[in-house]
Amino acid sequence: TLTGYIANFSVLNXEAYLFINDKYVLLDYAPGTXNDK
């Protein structure tokens, strides 16, 4: 557990979950995918 910063990477879902100061950010780091919305 990092103080004030926790980075959890979900490889199975090809998604990066960033927890910063109780803030939730979802980043899709899957390059070359046709899942662009």
Curated annotation (Swiss-Prot):
Keywords: Cytoplasm, Seed storage protein, Storage protein
Disulphide connectivity of cysteines: none
Tissue: Expressed in seeds (at protein level).
Entry keyword Kinase: no
An example molecular function term from Gene Ontology annotations: nutrient reservoir activity
Location within or outside the cell: Cytoplasm, Cytosol
Positions of Hemopexin repeats: 6-37
One GO CC term, this protein: cytosol
Chain's role: Binds hemin and thiamine.
Note: On the 2D-gel the determined pI of this protein is: 5.7, its MW is: 26 kDa.
Subunit structure: Dimer.
Protein name: Albumin-2
Organism taxonomic ancestry: Eukaryota, Viridiplantae, Streptophyta, Embryophyta, Tracheophyta
